[in-house]
Each structure stands twice: as structure tokens, then as C-alpha cells.
Amino acid sequence: MLIGIDVGGTTTDAVLVDGSRVEKTAYVPTDHNDLLGCLLGALDELVRGVDVSKIERVVLSTTLITNMIAEKKTDPVALVLIPGPGTNPQDYNLGPSIILDGAIDFRGKEIDRLNESQIKDAAARIKESGVSRVAVVGKFSQRNPAHEEKVSQIMSQILPGSKIELGHRVSGHLNFPRRAATTKLTLATKESYARFALAISRALEERRITAPVYILKADGGTLPLEGSLQMPVETIFSGPAASIM
């Protein structure tokens, strides 16, 4: 048997499917201040009287990340960019950012060296601001991540305990503005999403549901709950995707 739960704008809907047959449905009102409670409420209604050992797969949609971004409730992140020549980061609408010298070209060759004193000064400014999350993104870092890694190395010495996310680890695509935005949002939502995912895992364990859990992505594909911890932004528009499908 398969379970699907969709957190919608008005109701949270759940369905239990056995083969090609819909065995049971359930729904509860959606409380946008308690999305986890909505999911579990619908789940409890759905599995009442059901042998949970026969459940083979659980697929969830969630608007958690979408809501965090839309309501500006994400964690603060210092965005550090190494754009190189030919771009103006102010055109990207990424919010405040720190711009560093240095450049890697499209072949992965260094054409402009980093300025270490500039990096240390940037780290000092971040430390003074009290922000403990730093996203570092270079224009062609997916070709050669050396600059991102060097910036991370220097900043981690000045910002011990801070979480530093590097653009080339988040995405291998060439689109620099999109990679910068994705890296920033990944770091800004990761901790809240991890708490949400952990709560789901524990709740299913308490209900003796051992089936693998998947999160619906915006493209209609699914991602294992554990795998989604590294890329919570993959769940943006998870809810609307479920509505369309």
C-alpha cells in the first residue's frame, strides 16, 4: 500500500492506495502555522484501522520552504560573491552581498587572484554583524572550485562555528545568478527543514510506519526524505506540484 499526503492551501489531503484501488481518503484543515501537525493529523485519520506493516511507501508534499521564503522567515545568510569581470551582481536581485576580487574563467583557469586581506576583512564584517551562515559563490566555481574553497578556508578560521556553504557543492549548473540564489536559500532554510524532517521521521517511527518516505519536488519527481536534507530548496513548489498532479 502507498500513502500520499498533500498540504494544500485550505485542506491537507491524504490518500491510501492499494495497487490501482483507492482504499481510503482523509483530510484536515490546513494550519499554515503548524504544517507538521496537519500532515500527522491527516496521516492518523488515514491509517486508523489499517495494518501499517503493509505500507510500502509514503510520499509527502509540503509548502514549508515556500512559506518560509514568501513570508521572509528564513535564517539570515551572508552572501559572498566572486563574480569576476563582465557581471554586475546588483542586477541579480539577491539582496545585500559582499563582492570579492578574483576570477576563474569558463575553462576553469584562474585569471585574477584572490585578495586574502580582502577576504579577512569581509569575514571580520560578517563576524561583527552576528550572522553565522555564509554562502560563498564564484562565477565558474563548478569548473574550478579553488577560489570558493580558499575563501571558505580563510573565513572558517575567523568565523569558527559558522556554517559555510559553497556554490559548487549545491549546483553544477552554469547559471551564476541562479546558483547564488540556490546556495543562499539552501543555507537559509536547511536548519528549519532538518527539524521538520526529523519530526516526521520520529512521528512515523512512533506510529510503527517503517516504509521509506519521499518528498515531492516541483518537477513532479520525488526525493528521499533523508536526501532532501542537503537540498531543501528542491521542495519549493512541492505543494503546487501535488495540486497539478
Identify the residue ranges that each predicted region occupies.
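N-terminally biased helix-coil "hinge/interface" segments that flank
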Residues: 1-245
